[in-house]
Design a protein with these regions (language model features):
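Serine-esterase "nucleophile elbow" of acetyl-processing enzymes
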Residues: 33-97, 113-120
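Acidic/histidine-rich helix-loop elements
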Residues: 65-73, 93-110, 136, 140-144, ...
Length: 248
C-alpha cells in the first residue's frame, strides 16, 4: 500500500513538473512574440488626438506596453488610464518590449521608430518608465552612466514646446518565476540603484515621481511571470498614475 502511494506521488510530481515546464515555454514564447510583433510595428494602435484634447504619452518598455496583460490592448495601463481620464484626453501607448533607456544597451528605445512617433505626438503630458531591462548585467554600466543616458532621453521630451507635465516612474519589483527572475533582470538592482537613480532624475528635472516599487511591493499575485503585471496589476498602475495626474 505504501509502495503504491509513493508511486502515485512520484507520478503526480512528474505531471506537475511537465505542466510547469510547459507554462514556462508558453511564457517565453509569448514574450518573444511581443518582441518581434512590436518590431514589425503591428502592436501599437496609436490614436489621433482631437482638437483641444490633452495629449498623454506613456513611454516605456514591456510593462508599459502590456506584455501578458489579458485583454490587451484595452486592459494595458495606458488604455485604462485613458478611460479613467475620459473625454478631453487622448492617451497613447508608446511602450516597447525589451527596450532600455541607455542608448548603448543591446535594445535601446531611442533606436526605434516608435520613439520618434512618441516625440512627434507632441504630448502635453509624458509618463516615462525604464530600468527593468537596463538592470541586466549585460547592459548595466553603473548608476552614473544610467542617469546620464536616461537624462538625454528625458531631455528629448522636455525639449518639445508642447509639454506641460512629465512623470517618471520607478519600475516595480521583479520576483522569481519558477525558481528564478526571468529575462536576466537584476531584481536587487531594480530595488536599489534603479530606484535611487529614478528619484535623482525626478529631482534633477523637477518631474513628478511615482514609485511603483513601493506601490507593488508585496503584491506578487499581480504579476503574471514575476515581471509583467496582470490585467489587475495594470489597473492598479493606471489608478496610481491617474491619482498623480489629478493631484497636479
Amino acid at each position: 500500500m505504501n509502495g503504491e502511494t509513493a508511486k502515485k506521488r512520484t507520478s503526480a510530481k512528474r505531471v506537475i513538473g511537465v505542466v510547469l515546464a510547459f507554462l514556462i515555454v508558453i511564457a517565453e514564447c509569448g514574450l518573444l512574440m511581443a518582441y518581434y510583433m512590436g518590431e514589425l510595428g503591428q502592436l501599437h494602435p496609436l490614436k489621433e488626438a482631437k482638437d483641444g484634447d490633452v495629449k498623454v504619452a506613456c513611454v516605456g518598455d514591456s510593462i508599459t506596453f502590456g506584455t501578458f496583460v489579458f485583454g490587451w490592448p484595452e486592459a494595458a495601463y495606458p488604455s485604462v488610464l485613458g478611460n479613467m481620464l475620459g473625454k478631453g484626453y487622448t492617451v497613447n501607448n508608446y511602450g516597447y518590449p525589451g527596450r532600455c533607456a541607455q542608448s548603448d544597451a543591446d535594445r535601446p528605445y531611442v533606436k526605434e521608430e516608435l520613439y520618434q512617433k512618441a516625440l512627434d505626438f507632441n504630448a502635453d503630458v509624458v509618463i516615462i518608465m525604464f530600468g527593468s531591462n537596463d538592470s541586466k548585467n549585460a547592459d548595466w554600466k553603473g548608476e552614473e552612466h544610467f542617469i546620464a543616458e536616461y537624462s538625454a532621453l528625458i531631455e528629448s521630451f522636455l525639449a518639445r514646446p508642447s509639454i506641460k507635465e512629465m512623470y517618471i516612474m520607478a519600475p516595480p519589483p521583479a520576483w522569481e518565476f519558477f525558481g528564478k527572475v526571468r529575462y536576466n533582470i537584476n531584481s536587487d538592482r531594480v530595488k536599489n540603484e534603479i530606484n535611487r537613480a529614478t528619484r535623482t532624475l525626478a529631482d534633477k528635472y523637477d518631474l513628478g515621481f511615482i514609485d511603483l516599487y513601493e506601490v507593488f511591493d508585496g503584491k506578487r499575485e499581480l504579476f503574471a511571470d514575476g515581471v509583467h503585471p496582470t490585467d489587475k496589476g495594470a489597473k492598479l498602475l493606471a489608478e496610481t498614475v491617474y491619482s498623480a495626474i489629478r493631484r497636479k
